[in-house]
Amino acid sequence: MYDMTKLKTRYFDIRLKNGKILNLEPPKLKVLRKIASLSEVKTSGELTENDIKNLTEAVSLSLSKNKQNYKITSENVEENYDIDEMVDFMENYFDWVNSIQNSKN
């Protein structure tokens, strides 16, 4: 019998700007779809207020799914991280999600 409770959870370790270390858990598919949708940033033209709001929410959702149960609000992200940091984080986060999706347990 296949036992889903035996799957080993993989974590994405990250150090926040405040020095706190988090072990991010893989997102559930529903949350992953939402994060992917929210994090789509225009590659040409200017960012709109809505683009920035969506990216900030995507980063907040991604960072808040962690082993430590440490919640990070969109306001916290907006106050402490710039656009380059948010985009860089999302690129690395999706690279990690793709790597665990493509590897065996």
What residues fall within each predicted segment?
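Glycine-centered tight beta-turn/hairpin loop motif at sheet-sheet or coil-to-beta transitions
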Residues: 17-19
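Short acidic, Pro/Gly- and aromatic-enriched capping/linker segments at domain boundaries
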Residues: 1-13
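Short, surface-exposed, charged amphipathic helix/loop patches that serve as local interaction elements
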Residues: 9, 23-105
